Amino acid sequence: MKKNLLSAAVAATSVVVASSAVGQAYINDRLTGEALVYPIYSAQNGNDTYIHVVNTTGDYKAVKVRMIEGENSQEVLDFNLYMSPKDHFAFAITADGEGAKLKTTDNSCTVPIIPSAGTTADGKTIREVS
């Protein structure tokens, strides 16, 4: 790919929920579980990817969010998300002049903090592929 094209043509996003219950992931009858593996995100050709993480329980949750590049499986962004009971966290992966950017207006607790302007490659930006 040319340097000016966005990476993230094919990538995997995994959101792993850390809980004190069982260390095994499963899907129950209500279609909820302990892990989400989302197979692709894209910000190419005017497309955006929107992801919503919902805590359907009455418990507090610690969630690990990892974005992995499709071309060589390198991690391009990760952060911890701390959710209160029945909390909802939404973010978008959208085009940026230098690649792709994760943006959210949500005020949920993330570490590192995601600024309202979004976060990108060199200090948490989703990088381009050379």
Kindly label every feature range from the protein language model:
Residues K2-V10, S19-S130:
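Gly/Pro-rich, tryptophan- and cysteine-flecked surface segments typical
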Residues V15-V16:
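Surface-exposed, well-ordered secondary-structure segments
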